[in-house]
Amino acid sequence: MAKDFLNGKRTHFGNKRSHALNSSRRAWKPNLQKVRILVDGKPKKVWISARTLKSGKVTRV
């Protein structure tokens, strides 16, 4: 399972709840993108969430 390289975001699991409060399992997945960034001065392909990219915490190479 992919995980955000910087802040460790990953899939969260829980229940879907219908109007009658029946439950079934579901997953919330972060919007992960494979991006080349500089890690220790070298370019590396890592998984980064779109939210992290938009915030400017990471710059692409």
From Swiss-Prot:
Molecular function terms from GO: structural constituent of ribosome
Gene3D superfamilies documented for this protein: Ribosomal protein L28/L24 (2.30.170.40)
Bias-annotated ranges (Basic residues): 9-19
Keyword Ribonucleoprotein: yes
Keywords: Ribonucleoprotein, Ribosomal protein
Signal peptide: none
A GO cellular-component term linked to this record: ribosome
Region described as Disordered: spans on this chain: 1-26
InterPro entries on file: Bacterial_rp_bL28 (IPR050096), Ribosomal_bL28 (IPR026569), Ribosomal_bL28/bL31-like_sf (IPR034704), Ribosomal_bL28_bact-type (IPR001383), Ribosomal_bL28_sf (IPR037147)
One of the protein's GO biological processes: translation
Highest rank taxon of the organism: Bacteria
Family of this protein: Belongs to the bacterial ribosomal protein bL28 family.
This protein's name: Large ribosomal subunit protein bL28
Gene source species: Levilactobacillus brevis (strain ATCC 367 / BCRC 12310 / CIP 105137 / JCM 1170 / LMG 11437 / NCIMB 947 / NCTC 947)
Organism ancestry: Bacteria, Bacillati, Bacillota, Bacilli, Lactobacillales
